[in-house]
Amino acid sequence: MGAEALSNRTNWQMGARISGDAGERTFAAQVAPYLGAEYVVQHRPPKLKIYSEEKWIKLDTRITNTVTGLSLYIENKEGNNGGNAHERVYKFLSPALKRVVRETFNTVENPFFLVFSGRTFQGQKYKDEINLLCEGENYAIMTSDYENIQEVANQIMEIV
């Protein structure tokens, strides 16, 4: 594809970014009312500086239990047109990354909770992959209209 064709094609990444940002905000707003008064939900918490040379990871939401002082970080992947956005969350399954975040940022034992939302993740292929690769981890696949938000909030309160 030539330079002109490339510059004139649809920028699918921008659409995906808008959809992803909306999904992050939606989850934080949807879960907050179902958590107890002792929970603080922070959308776009500070970056976690864990690598050398001021490199960091950035998660979508932090939920803190003000009684225990412990936090849980949420990474939300919103998908509405297929694709592989969900594959980028698998780094959060790394035992070493979990250990560093837990030791540095006052979190629960498993500091990450992965959320998959949007039309894409209603498909059986995606559900099967996520259920297999995230087995034993903190995660939820949101139903199309967040009908399972109470269940997910309960799951989060059991963790943190």
Predicted regions and their residues:
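Active-site metal-binding core of divalent-cation-utilizing nuclease and nuclease-like domains
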Residues: V40-T68
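Catalytic cores of nucleic-acid endonucleases
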Residues: L70-L72, N76-E135
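Non-catalytic C-terminal interaction segments of nucleic acid-processing enzymes
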Residues: K127-V160
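Hydrophobic beta-strand residues in large extracellular and virion-surface proteins
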Residues: V31, V41, D60-I63, I74, ...
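Hydrophobic, Leu/Ile/Phe/Ala-enriched alpha-helical segments that form helix-helix packing faces
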Residues: F27-L35, A96-T104, I130, I156, ...
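Phosphate/oxyanion-binding active-site loops and adjacent basic polyanion-contact surfaces
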Residues: S19-F27, E54, N84-V89
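Interdomain/boundary linker segments immediately adjacent to catalytic/signaling cores
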Residues: M1-K49
